[in-house]
Amino acid sequence: MKKTIRQTIVSAVLASTLLLGGQAMAANFNYQDNPFTLVYANAITKNEAGKVNIHPVKYRVNGITIAANVYTPANFDPNKKYPALTVAHPNGGVKEQVAGLYAQKLAEQDFITIAADAAYQGASGGEPRQTDKPFNRINDIHGMVDFLESFKGVDTNNIGALGICGGGGYTFAAAQSDKRIKAVATVSLFNTGLVRRNGLGDSQISTIQERLQQAAEARTKEAQGNVEYSANADLTKITQADIDKMPTGLYRYGFEYYGKTHYHSNSTPRYTISSLLDLMTFDATDHADLINQPLLMIAGSNADTKYMTDQAMQKATGTADKKEVIIEGASHIETYRKPEYVSQISEALTQFFKAKL
């Protein structure tokens, strides 16, 4: 049974690993061609007077060094006050991908924005690498707020939060307690704890106890210096036929995004198996009623993750100022990159944050 469950876990995670692809895959956006290693359309290539500028920064959260990019609006004057936004990246993603895209888009609308790599991930510090625990991800968002409060030019009474995919779930959770966040928005929310526990679309409920046992065993090994990860496949050997067999659009489109079109060397879906001890007992919506801030939730009509946005919106009973925007025709990953959908989402986010901050 243990072997069967382990194979089930590896197969499921391999699918999610495939959506980040391997280093051998050619990228439409080559992170090495951009001085800030940004991999999205119309990304900043240099700081120029009178335009949106990017500022790589480092700071500490709970003793761990966090790497982040701050975007300042065109003609930024640090002696003036600007509304500001935190932007939390997807699971396995990094600040240079879709989080950077929306951070730049919103900076173009006169917001100061910050996109940070999660602790233990990307260019941020922390060991073991790829530890992926809700407490850390939520504190990453609190830490971004901390940083913004000390950044000259930020109107500390007008800080909002945006999260994408897994970062959306963690932003939704962070806003439940952090009332410094005055407005909350999510794009393609992914409730990581729910999916790690039940599987995407409740496809792994029958193996919950066995996977918890595996996580406990991994914790023991980790304490002895042997870190176990969710997948260790040689992605250079994955074929197109393997990709075509992927069961969901999330994985197929994700492979194209992370593995081909927007590949970044710091991005990986791998996480420590011991992290499941925390992930599988977490749900981003458990205290959704504590959100009393204005709330905007955006999802694609064709996203196989849309049900998570629907559930979170339904549970957010503590705010009367809430709106769900459905992007017709969009899948989960298409909200990261397809120009017409990115434009619609950027417009909705701009209108929301300008009205609420």
Kindly label every feature range from the protein language model:
Residues 79-90:
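Short beta-strand element of the alpha/beta-hydrolase
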Residues 131-152:
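Alpha/beta-hydrolase active-site loop
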Residues 172-256:
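Alpha/beta-hydrolase-fold enzymes
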Residues 291, 297-299:
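Short beta-strand/loop motif that positions the catalytic acidic residue
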Residues 330-342:
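Catalytic histidine-centered segment of alpha/beta-hydrolase-like enzymes
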Residues 105-125:
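Conserved alpha/beta-hydrolase
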Residues 92-104, 118, 309:
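The serine-hydrolase catalytic nucleophile loop
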Residues 31-80:
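N-terminal cap/lid segment of alpha/beta-hydrolase-fold proteins
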